[in-house]
Regions:
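Alpha-helix C-terminal capping segments
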Residues: 1, 21, 136-140
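Conserved inter-motif catalytic segment of the P-loop NTP-binding fold
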Residues: 2-88, 92
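Generic low-polarity alpha-helical segments
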Residues: 1, 54-56, 107, 193-198
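Phosphate-binding/switch region of NTP-binding enzymes
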Residues: 47, 79-196
Length: 198
């Protein structure tokens, strides 16, 4: 059964022309751009329950503030409001995917890692918006940018892309702790010899 894909583009960075370069069928893609987090969660829940949609992509988890945060002054402290909200949202998403056992639903959540300052021991890397997503997700893949690659052209040299490392840090549906690297090309450089800048 052919089903559709939905992109919840909170960052508002997706452009149809650029997506078409990667083979995305813009006619079949459902593109939504919510402005409030509460609307975002309701939309994702409805998409996951929709029989015609099998894949929902959220880009990105850290790009939108809570309704409470947006509606108040910059001086007002909102302690962990995003974490509390996303903890509840993850449970709603899980319930939506489990509501129909015969329907295959997949939710891809893009998030960002940050370096926490003042950490003398242990891992300073933190993921925003609470711990619920770590417990809920079945598969977690970490992407990290590596060396930029340049190519010599008639005008000099240009950056044509960079190597990306990926690591499967959690996997409930397969073998975890696997890693790989791949080359992400920025432009079609016509097979020009590439070399590392580092």
């Amino acid at each position: 059964v052919a089903r559709r894909v939905a992109l919840v583009d909170i960052e508002a960075t997706y452009t149809p022309d650029w997506g078409e370069n990667f083979g995305i069928d813009n006619e079949g893609l459902i593109l939504v751009r919510p402005t409030l987090l509460s609307n975002c969660v309701d939309i994702i829940q409805a998409l996951l329950e929709n029989e015609e949609i099998s894949l929902v992509v959220l880009d990105s988890m850290s790009a939108i503030g809570t309704d409470e945060e947006i509606g108040k002054s910059m001086e007002d402290q909102q302690m962990a409001s995003g974490a509390r909200f996303w903890n509840k949202a993850c449970r709603k998403f899980q319930a939506a995917m489990n509501s129909n056992p015969t329907k295959e639903s997949t939710l891809i959540v893009i998030n960002s890692a940050y370096q926490k300052t003042g950490i003398a021991y242990g891992d300073p890397e933190v993921i925003r918006n609470g711990e619920q997503l770590k417990r809920t997700k079945s598969l977690s893949v970490k992407f990290k940018a590596l060396k930029k690659l340049n190519a010599k052209v008639d005008e000099g040299e240009i950056v044509i892309g960079r190597n990306i490392s990926i690591e499967c840090v959690k996997n409930k549906v397969g073998v975890p702790q696997r890693s790989a690297t791949f080359f992400y090309a920025y432009v079609d450089y016509g097979g020009t010899q590439a070399y590392s800048t580092d």
